[in-house]
Structures are given as C-alpha cells and as structure tokens.
Amino acid sequence: MKFTIFTPAYNRAYTLGRLYDSLRKQTVINFEWLIVDDGSTDNTPELCTTFESDLFPVRYYRVQNQGKCAAVNKGAELAHGEWFYIVDSDDWLPEDAMERLTAEEKLIESERVGVLCGMRHYPSGERIGGNLSFSRVECTAFDFRYRMKVKGDLAEVIRTEVVRENLYPQFNDEHFCPVAVLFNRIALKHLTHYFNQNIYYCKYLPDGLTAHITKVRMESPKATLICYAEQAACPVPFALKVRSWINFWRFGFCLQQKDFMKRFRIPLWAWLCWLPGWLMHRRDCKSLNKK
C-alpha cells in the first residue's frame, strides 16, 4: 500500500461524508482510508459502517477519548501505507490530490526526504497564506518557513516510519499536544519535498481546536511546555525563540505538578521571559473568567 489517508474523528458525522465522497473521486487509487474515532458521542460509529468501498480499503477503529494527537499515534501504529497523510474529518481532497502526490514522490531527489508537502486551499480556491512563486524545492521545514518566509498551513504527507519514530508525547491527564511537536522533531532530522500544488481543501469550523486554542493549551500544560521548549531549541529566528519562552512560562503557570519543570534545561536569558509570561497568564485567566 502506497498511502494511508488517516482521519482522526470526534463528533464530525456531519462532515465525514464529504471527505468520503472526495476520496471516491480520486483519479488515482493507491491508498487506504484509516479512521480512528476518538470516542465520538454522535452517530460517527454508525456512519462509518456505511463507508464500504470497492475502490479502496476502509478501516475504522474506535478508541477512548484521548485527543487528536493520541489518535495520530494510534493511526501510525495501524497504518499499512508507506506514507501517512493526515486529513481532518472536516476537510477534503481535490480529485487529483493522490495523482499529484504519486507523481511528486517519483521526483524526490534526496534520501533525507521524510515528508512530501503540497498546499492547502480554502474552498474558494485561494491558497491558505497567500500565493507562492516556487515550483518545487527540497529543504528543511525551518528553511521553508523562515528563509523563504512562507506562511499558512500546509498539507504534509509523512513517511509512516518517520511518524512512528517521532510520536507525540502523551499524558494520562491531558488530551492535547501541539502538532508542532511532531513537525519540529521531524524537521531536525529530515528534509521535506515541497511542491506548489493544491492537494487539500480546508475549512476552519467554529467548534474546532483553533477556535479555543488558549483554553486547550491551559488544560494541557505538559505537552504545551514540551512544544515551546523544543521550539526554542530549534534553528528558528531569535524573535520566535523569545516568544517560545514567553509562552513556556505563560502556560507553565497552569501546571499542577511543578516538578515537571525540572525536565527542561532553561537558558539564563530565558528567565527574562518569566514576567511577560506571567502577565499573559493573568490576562488568559481574566479572559476565561469573563466567558
């Protein structure tokens, strides 16, 4: 199997059908569809039993609610494909997405490439983050973001073995981990093959994670701190390192187990970020109390 299209699902029965239809319309069928249901309380289980297809394998698994990143870890364990393509339950693919991915895989030049990456578009056809002038390039994700100054979410397709080597950290008392943890870890070891073609349609919903991300991070401070501490140690602009340490302290004040802080090596200058982090934490608390 060449590709695993992986969908973590939680109470998205009203959008999954659109994704299913887009998969059936693919011009190249060389994939399986793997769904991990993260404890949905709507009719997602019943709906997924109807997604039988003579075109491609459909596999459905239901797990106890632990959050999207835990579902991704489970999906990587179960995947049969060489490449792992995370497609959220409220998004869908253009008809030629898998055809384009198949063609781009054949154009990979470096053995260090661990990720294929195309563009995400809004339903209107506009690229998320604005238009770009390049055709294709192989580089680290850090170079692509900060040297080429590319903005906006992208559509990453990762070698399954690479995902398995860089699983998200999980904690029994937390249900969230920033997706940047996975991609930063991969970028330190692997190149990405970028190509300037749309392979993903994205629509941000008002009940999605991005709509209430501050509250979510406050409720999962351990994973959030890991993200910001690791990001600050990456080859990123100094301004981003400063913001990372400010956010490290900001969400560190949400920790119930203060001993968790001992696992981090905090540079001396990062203590200057303590006060702005505390001020942002106070603002977050006041903002949440008003809601």
Model-derived segments and spans:
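Short aromatic/hydrophobic "clamp" motif used to bind/position activated sugar donors
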Residues: 84
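Short beta-strand/loop segment that forms part of the nucleotide-sugar
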Residues: 30-39, 59-63
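Conserved donor NDP-sugar-binding/catalytic core segment of glycosyltransferases
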Residues: 96-130
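Short, well-formed alpha-helical segments that are part of the catalytic scaffolds
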Residues: 11-25
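Glycine-rich, basic loop-to-helix element that forms the pyrophosphate-binding segment
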Residues: 63-79
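A conserved acidic beta->alpha catalytic loop
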Residues: 22, 37-47, 88
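Catalytic core of nucleotide-sugar-dependent glycosyltransferases
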Residues: 198-205, 212-239
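Conserved nucleotide-sugar donor-binding catalytic segment
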Residues: 122, 126-211
